[in-house]
Design a protein with these regions (language model features):
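Predominantly extracellular/luminal regions of secreted and cell-surface proteins
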Residues: 77, 183-192
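Beta-strand segments within the central parallel beta-sheet cores of soluble alpha/beta enzyme folds
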Residues: 80, 255-261
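Acidic, glycine-rich active-site loops and adjacent beta-strand->loop/helix elements
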Residues: 83-84, 235-238, 261-266
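A glycine- and small-aliphatic-rich helix-loop capping segment at beta-alpha/alpha-beta transitions
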Residues: 95-96, 246-250, 272-274
């Protein structure tokens, strides 16, 4: 491979063929310099944690944060009442995304065990954990969808809301529990089967899986002197994060800057808004 460079002494262009080229960040990596998101986070950052749902499907009828908000060191507690009601997709895909706009930052309806209920920010992890235990939530527990074979056109809607939308024609329909649907055929399938001496039909199931990168999902944010929200995140898609975050917060993209430091692996899992 050939590389065209400029000689700083003469100003003339020259090419490197079959010669090693030093990576700009190589020395920092091998000497353990701070290059990853967690290395760069200021030591006085607020700690942010999320209160999670214990139910697979429920509506939040009441949420009381009064006592929790009085815990020393707690700066902010947010519920579904405090965030913009603009649905978005977490998928880091080029606009218009094929994935439906089905999420809110916080929603009154929770759809799986572990879904977000409240966001707590405080000066210390101990304060945040204490406040989280003091938040009182009253749920209307609903019947969940537990079997994908029963979900389509079933009696339980995962997303019954009217502001759900799909930007692309991928066969999505929230009133049928479909995030996408479609099919494709080539040639005469029945004729091909007729010419086979044996036909084997099987159904195979695999468990959910996830990439195992060494650096887990992490981010920190701060406001700069221009009033912009700066997001430093271990993401593979900084420009998608900027666009999707601006939409979710209902602000202009010009008010958000996303910085992607060196990431410790991603393998596609970090192609999302984290």
């Amino acid at each position: 491979m050939a590389y065209t460079q400029i000689n700083p002494a003469t100003g003339k262009k020259f090419r490197l063929i079959s010669a090693p080229v030093v990576k700009k960040d190589a020395k920092a990596l091998v000497t353990g310099k701070p290059v990853y998101t967690d290395d760069l986070a200021p030591k006085d950052c607020l700690i942010v944690k999320v209160l999670r749902s214990p139910y697979a499907h429920a509506l939040i009828e009441e949420i009381d944060c009064k006592v929790a908000s009085r815990v020393p060191g707690i700066e902010c507690i947010l519920t579904w009442k405090d965030v913009p009601q603009k649905r978005f997709t977490m998928a880091g895909q080029t606009y218009p995304e094929p994935s439906p706009y089905d999420r809110l930052i916080l929603d009154q309806r929770v759809r799986f065990v572990g879904d977000a209920v409240a966001i707590i920010a405080g000066e210390t992890e101990a304060a945040v954990d204490h406040a989280m235990r003091l938040i009182k939530v009253k749920y209307q527990v609903l019947e969940p969808v537990l079997d994908m074979h029963d979900s389509k056109d079933g009696k339980i809607l995962v997303h019954p809301e009217d502001n759900w939308k799909a930007l692309c024609n991928v066969g999505a329909d929230n009133k049928r529990n479909l995030c996408a649907s479609g099919g494709e055929t080539h040639g005469d399938l029945e004729a091909a089967f007729a010419g086979c001496s044996h036909i084997v039909e099987k159904t195979y199931h695999t468990k959910a899986n996830q990439q195992a990168m060494m650096e887990t999902f992490r981010a920190f944010t701060y406001m700069d002197v221009y009033g912009r929200l700066n997001v430093v995140a271990s993401t593979q898609v900084p420009f998608h994060v900027r666009r999707i975050l601006a939409h979710a917060l209902d602000v202009s993209k010009s008010r958000i800057r996303v910085i992607k430091p060196r990431i410790g692996g991603g393998f596609g899992a970090k192609q999302t808004v984290v």
